[in-house]
Amino acid sequence: ITFQGCSPARQTVITNAITRARADVRAAVSALPTKAPVSTFSTWFGVYND
């Protein structure tokens, strides 16, 4: 992922934050009692398409 006008250090921070957020989302999704909405959710956010 590249961000226009960001230093490499800032890009790393942003990328790491996104990675952590996606991991949190994965954990939340896997904790759901039903898997029915998961495919829609993951399609919207690309959660399972790294």
UniProtKB/Swiss-Prot annotation:
Keyword Hydrolase appears in the UniProt entry: yes
- Which one GO biological process term can you cite for this protein? negative regulation of translation
The superkingdom of the source organism is Eukaryota
Keywords linked to the UniProt accession: Antimicrobial, Fungicide, Hydrolase, Protein synthesis inhibitor, Toxin
- Catalytic activity annotated for this protein? Endohydrolysis of the N-glycosidic bond at one specific adenosine on the 28S rRNA
**MF term (GO), any:** metallopeptidase activity
Return the Gene3D superfamilies for the record.
Answer: Collagenase (Catalytic Domain)
What is the top EC class of this enzyme, as a single word? hydrolase
Entry EC number(s): 3.2.2.22
> What function does the entry list?
N-glycosylase that inhibits protein synthesis by depurinating ribosomal rRNA, and thus acts as a ribosomal inactivating protein (RIP). Has adenine polynucleotide glycosidase activity on the poly(A) substrate A30-ssDNA. Inhibits cell-free translation in rabbit reticulocyte lysate system with an IC(50) of 1 nM. May function in the defense response to pathogens. Displays antifungal activity against C.comatus and P.piricola, but not against R.solani, M.arachidicola and C.gossypii. Inhibits mycelial growth in P.piricola with an IC(50) of 2.5 uM.
- The protein depicted here goes by the name Ribosome-inactivating protein lyophyllin
